[in-house]
Amino acid sequence: MWNDEIIRKATADERLTVSHMALLFAIITLCRRENGYKSIQTSRKILMAKSHIGSLPTYHKCLKELVSLKYVNYFPSYNPKLGSRIQIRE
């Protein structure tokens, strides 16, 4: 299954911190709840709560680095009622 592969890859990657892992696992958990889709539409508030990240700078840093390390794609939504779309990369 695709999420097992991403988990294996992430746990072997020494560049990722606990915060990166928590955010990535929160994204994977939400994807699993969406019937296994690799893409979710969610808000920063939900991801911060699920990953137990309490700091905005930490959240933004981790998300930016997960994008640059090619773990996820991020498509921001500038509509406060719509969440941003996050897609797990293969």
Predicted regions and their residues:
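Short recognition helix of helix-turn-helix/winged-helix DNA-binding domains
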Residues: 1-50, 68, 81
